[in-house]
């Protein structure tokens, strides 16, 4: 119309949907709970601070107790028995939570899927626990920080996902930092054991597979968290109990831990309880603040865990730990940033072409059109 003001609208702008998402997030029907504690009526900042405090407090105790258990003389061969006890605790915690909530929802995920999840969970936690007996604890934590590498491969193979260049840059940075950290550890640790590296590497492979299988199963069947915990750890407990019974390691583990009940079962209870509660809080943090922010918080927690490990448990230190650890942190930052940036390989090609033309002082290439569509009304 003549004389009317024209307004420019950006098609595909993320801000167009921002209010709709905000209204949905603030709807009264959406409950935010950590176990039996309702956080729905707190504002977003308070929810974030409470979740952060819980993550740091619980996982710092978790890491401390895990390393403390392996300081017990003679406990090193019993990492798998510790996993068996941990599975029993997790199953009990999940059953108690489900009973208190009085949930009568039938099982959502097929038993065949749970059988696979239990096997992968057993591999992840059993191999990870066993590696503590052979590796410097900070090295084990650094390996676990680099979970993105096998997860990236697993998501492509299992779910057929496509990833941008930032994800691959992040994985490359993590690989480099991991190699440098391991080399530094082998130089300062007189009892450096390659078998520990082998164990934690297998644990990461299982972790990558379980993350993708679990995500796919929970997305398709919409199973509650406590159901996944009960069946995954319950079936895993049966697997491991049968294997250890047939191999004779179950009797040996029971006999050893009977001599040190507080240092084994008592510490394992705190170790398992803090781990179980920590999982619930991380899931709540993901639900309220998003996965990138949750990844940032858990990464900061791991950095503090490594620092406290050097404080509470005497071990040699080299400045190479710091530099290689910072490279890993940079890789994690790139991974978090990739969730917000939709950079593609085509974008990289255009950027490289622009830089190439600028260096050679060539005229700019003709743009086939702006990526942002404009509509004038």
From Swiss-Prot:
Residues in the signal sequence = none
- Recite the UniProt keywords alphabetically: Developmental protein, Golgi apparatus, Membrane, Transmembrane, Transmembrane helix, Transport
Query: How does the record say this protein sits in the membrane?
Result: Multi-pass membrane protein
GO MF term list:
3'-phosphoadenosine 5'-phosphosulfate transmembrane transporter activity
Q: Which domain of life is it from?
A: Eukaryota
Q: Answer yes or no on keyword Iron.
A: no
- Any one cellular component term from GO for this entry? Golgi apparatus
Q: Which InterPro entries match?
A: SCL35B1-4/HUT1
One matching Pfam family is UAA
Please give the family membership noted in the entry: Belongs to the nucleotide-sugar transporter family. SLC35B subfamily.
**Function in brief:** Mediates the transport of adenosine 3'-phospho 5'-phosphosulfate (PAPS), from cytosol into Golgi. PAPS is a universal sulfuryl donor for sulfation events that take place in the Golgi. Essential for viability. Involved in glycosaminoglycan synthesis and the subsequent signaling. May be involved in hh and dpp signaling by controlling the sulfation of heparan sulfate (HS).
Protein name as catalogued: Adenosine 3'-phospho 5'-phosphosulfate transporter 2
Per the UniProt record, the source organism is Anopheles gambiae
